[in-house]
Amino acid sequence: MTESSLNVLPQSSGLLARPLLVRFGAMGDLVLIQPMIRLLAARYGAPVDLLAAGGWVRPLYQGQPDVGEIHLLAKRKLPLWLSAEKRQLLQWLQQTGPRPVWYCDFDEKLVPLLAQAGMDERWVVRAKAVGTRDGEHLVDFSQRLARTVPPALRHVTEQRMEVSGPHGGQPAEAAGAQTAHPAAPSRTQADLDDRDPNLGISATMQADVQDWLQAKRWLGKPLLLVQAGNRRTMRTGLRRRMSTNTKWWPEDNWAAIIRMLAERHPDAVILLVGAPPEADLNDELLQRAGVVQAFNVARELPIPRLLALQARAAGMVTVDTGPAHTAAAVGCPLVVLFGVADPVRIRPRGGNTPVEVLQAMHDGKPDMTAISVDAVVQAWQRLPLRQGANGEDTAASAAGHVSYP
C-alpha cells in the first residue's frame, strides 16, 4: 500500500471488501455517477462494486476502469420471500461481509436489506442524509457523497490522514453521524481534478466499430448523429404526443434538422441512432427528411458499439436521454434539447466536451415543443465540431478519453 491510496477497508475471509455503490436509475443517471466511481476507487484503493437495475448496465460498465462486480436487481419492491434475485443478493452481501456503501437513491428501498446483511447505518452513506444543494449538478453532488466517510471508517480514516499528512482544499461535509474528509491524493492528481464523466473505449470496442463502419463504407467520413427517440417513443402515432412524453419534439422538426445537417455537411454521413424500439420513429423521420446520406442504425447499436461510434462522431443532436450523456462522456460535441428536466442539475458533462443546451417555455412551463427549429440550427452553428475523429487509425485516446485493452 502506498501513501497515495487511502485503503481503510475491512477484510473478510482474507479478501478485500470493496466499496459498494447503489444506484437505481436511467442510463443518464448511471453515467453521471462515473466520476464518483473513479473517486471512490482512488480513495479506497479498490475497484467499486455496483448494484443497479437494467440490462444496459453491464454493457455500459463491464470492463470500465475502477468498476468491480456488477449486480442487478430488477424488482426492488418485491418482498424477500417472493424474490429469488433479492435472496441471492442478500447471500452475496452476507458473504462479502461489512463494507462501506454509498447509497445514491433517495427512496431507500434497499436500506433494510443492507442492514440485514450486516451493513447498518454505521456502514452506509445515504444520499438522503447528505442532501442536495440548490443549483447543484448531480455530478458535483455525487462527488460530495463520495467524500463522505461512513461512521464505521471515520476513526481509521482520520488516523490514516494523520499519518499521510494534512490535505487541504476540500471542506468537510456533515451528514448526521457521517463526516466528509478531504480526498487523499489519487494515482495521479488529474484523476481527482477531473470531475466529469469519462467513459473508456476498449480496443475490442474500437475494432468492432471500425469493422462495422468499414463494412458500411463510412470509415473516414465525418459522422453526425441524431437521437430523436427516448424510452417513450416506442409508442406510435398520436400516443407519442401524450402529455407524459415530455421529450417529444415534432417529427417535422427533426426532419428539418436532418435536412439542415445534409445541406451544411454534404460530405458527412448522418446516422439516426437509438435503441431498437426507436427504429420505427427513425424510419419515419428519414421518410419525411428525404435525405440520401442519412441512415437508421438503431437496430445495429449495442451499447459498446454506440459508445465507440460516439467517440468517432463529429457532433450530435439529441433529446435529453442516456445517449446524450454517453456522448459527452466520450468527447462528442452535442446539442441537447431539454423538456421539463432541469439542465442545471442533469445537463450532460464531459470535461472539455462542447455541450449546447436548449430549453424553452410554454405557458410559463418548460416544454420541449416550444424549442424552435431555428434555435437548434443556431446552436449547431455555435458548436465546435470534432475533426478527423473517424479515421482508419483513430483511437479513443486521441480524443482525450481513456482507452484500455
Language-model features: where?
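Catalytic machinery of carbohydrate-active enzymes
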Residues: 1-405
